[in-house]
Regions:
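Extended, charged amphipathic alpha-helical segments
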Residues: 207-348, 448-459
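C-terminal helix-loop subdomains that flank or include functional centers
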Residues: 293, 312, 319-503
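Extended, regular secondary-structure scaffolds
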Residues: 113-117, 121-233
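A short, surface-exposed helix-loop junction/capping segment
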Residues: 92-97, 300-302, 350
Length: 503
């Protein structure tokens, strides 16, 4: 049996180069340099090209986009209702150390989401070591419990789905590459695991020689693997990366940053043009020795290209950055300069980003539900664990909302209810949880005291323009009910000569 690259799935072969490009675009640094994504000039030798790769900076937008998505998705962790799994001895250890590497289940799922955004999808296997323990408690003492492992797409070589009589697609074959070890310059050692519904095979490969080293029964009766896409595609087993467009635009920016670097370097350091027999250098204060009989037309001179194109290249880079923001619906989030969007345009941008994040949360929720079904199957429990990811995300422009509320308050609308609700909205922008609930109670209590005009009060008798104030005029203007006889009027105080200038 052959287990090398010749037996990979056709879609694996179609997407392998793209996966490498996406992960290099996300990683940046030396990984991106090694990808050699700069266009080589005509007659450019290997050393000059390597130097240009080393001098060209890389502005990593892909990593920024992926982590902004992740920060929004995991700002509020998912809620889980375990039902019959409550009290299971393996539940708490699994939640605290899901992959037997010290990471909690939330941290593991967040990492899966990040790498799914990069590659387009990842696979998660939930396995359980073989055990001879008689009870679940003995298994826990031996650390025999379910655990999860993530496989990135380049390590899942082949897969197959089959349609069941009910019409549902079921994973019936999966081949994963578990480890690759470079023994020496000519020898590579690789371990593969092949899953089917009834057996599990472990294969060991050294270069082109493959050998099956272990066969076990699949006691679960199904392949314990879950496919987690970043975005669904029309091809089963292949997801769409969040970087599918942004990575190519980032590469175009990388090309133009190389042009910027060369324009600056060459325009600041002109090239000395001289005849072969002239003794000269281009350094500051250098002395040029010319033959006495040299033709005047052959005098040395400096060749300096124009740097006028620099602004055009920089403007092109800015346009591409704006394109990346539009592709990822990040125009209102990633903008570093003053945003000139209208309120409606910005709200639309937030809504589009919120819809994208909500779709991602639904995919994660579905994947986690499948993982908990596998957990319950391994532990012999009823698979009734419920998972709830946030359906909407707090994407708000706090400055604009606060300004709007302040303007609304200053309009002078005669409504105590409206004033209370405005105060509550302002509190919502600043506080949360218990502090917010307490603030709402205080606002309502304060409004009931300040807005209580059931008893008579005193009002001034005259307007500022000397017009007479009627007894119930103030109540009518602020929307309160009239009282019998109206409010009492304050009698004007007669001024004396000693009151002049006193305030």
């Amino acid at each position: 049996m052959r287990l090398n690259a010749d037996t990979t799935h056709p879609e694996y072969d179609n997407n392998e180069a793209q996966w490498e490009f996406y992960v290099r675009s996300y990683m940046g640094g030396q990984n991106y340099i090694d990808g050699q994504y700069l266009t080589k000039y005509i007659s450019e030798n290997k050393d000059d090209y390597a130097r240009r790769l080393d001098l060209t900076p890389m502005d990593n937008h892909c990593k920024n986009i992926v982590h902004i998505y992740s920060s929004f998705l995991w700002r509020v962790p998912p809620t889980r209702v375990f039902n019959t799994a409550v009290g299971n001895v393996a539940l708490d250890p699994f939640l605290n150390d899901a992959d037997l590497d010290g990471r909690s289940f939330n941290a593991f799922m967040r990492e899966c989401q990040i790498w799914a955004s990069v590659y387009g999808h990842v696979w998660v296997m939930m396995d359980k070591p073989k055990s001879t323990a008689g009870t679940k408690a003995e298994e826990l003492v031996q650390e025999i419990r379910p655990y999860v492992t993530m496989f990135t797409p380049e390590n899942v070589l082949d897969w197959e789905w089959s349609r069941t009589p009910s019409g549902r697609f079921e994973l019936t074959y999966l081949k994963v590459r578990e480890s690759v070890t470079r023994v020496d310059q000519t020898t590579t050692e690789t371990y593969y695991r092949v899953w089917t519904k009834d057996k599990i095979e472990l294969w060991h490969s050294i270069n082109e020689l493959d050998k099956m080293v272990e066969v076990d029964d699949n006691v679960l009766g199904k392949i314990p693997a879950v496919f987690i896409p970043a975005n669904r595609s029309i091809v089963r087993g292949i997801g769409i990366s969040d970087l599918s467009d942004a990575a190519y635009m980032q590469r175009a920016i990388y090309q133009e940053l190389s042009e910027v670097e060369q324009l600056i370097r060459i325009s600041n350091h002109p090239t000395l043009v001289k005849s072969f027999g002239t003794d000269a250098s281009a350094g500051a204060g250098a002395i040029i020795n010319m033959p006495d009989d040299m033709d005047a037309n052959l005098k040395p001179f400096q060749l300096q290209p124009s740097g006028q194109n620099l602004d055009a290249v920089r403007a092109s880079i800015e346009d591409k950055i704006q394109s990346i923001n539009r592709m990822s619906h990040m125009g209102a989030v990633r903008g570093t300069d003053a945003i000139t969007m209208s309120g409606v345009a910005m709200q639309t941008e937030f809504q589009m980003l919120n819809a994208k994040l909500s779709e991602k949360a639904d995919l994660l929720e579905l994947a986690e539900e499948q993982l908990w079904i596998l957990f319950c199957d391994w532990q012999g429990l009823t698979p009734d664990v419920e998972v709830f990811y946030p359906d909407s995300f707090d994407l708000r422009d706090y400055d604009k909302e606060l300004m709007f509320l302040q303007q609304l308050r200053s309009t002078g609308v005669k409504s105590t209810t409206l004033a209370v609700e405005i105060d509550k909205k302002i509190a919502d922008l600043i506080l949360d949880d218990e502090s917010l609930a307490k603030a709402h109670v205080e606002i309502e209590e304060k409004a009931s005291v300040l807005g209580d005009f059931s008893d008579k009060t005193q009002i001034y008798s005259y307007h500022i323009d000397a017009g007479v104030v009627s007894p119930n005029e103030i109540r009518e203007k602020i929307g309160l009910e009239d009282v019998d006889g109206g409010d009492s009027l304050i009698e004007p105080k007669e001024e004396s000569s000693g009151d002049t200038g006193q305030f």
